[in-house]
Amino acid sequence: MEIVVDAIYEKGVLKLKKSINLPEGCEVEIKIIPKKISEKTFGILKLSDKEIKEILEEIENGGE
């Protein structure tokens, strides 16, 4: 059985964002996959397609 749960790392502890139902003493394997910046910031800014294209072009050109 595979379960995917978002978590946050704070003060040396990995905290799950939702509870999971596992039996006491159950051993698990954890695979850490950091969220991409695009996933963390999705929906925060309202940008037009033109603005997004300009930002991407600026990044690709090294900020020029």
UniProtKB/Swiss-Prot annotation:
Family affiliation: Belongs to the UPF0165 family.
Record-linked InterPro entries: AF2212-like, AF2212-like_dom_sf
Protein name according to UniProt: Putative antitoxin MJ0975
Function summary: Possibly the antitoxin component of a type II toxin-antitoxin (TA) system. Its cognate toxin is VapC2 (Potential).
Keywords recorded for this protein, A-Z: Toxin-antitoxin system
Keyword Aminoacyl-tRNA synthetase appears in the UniProt entry: no
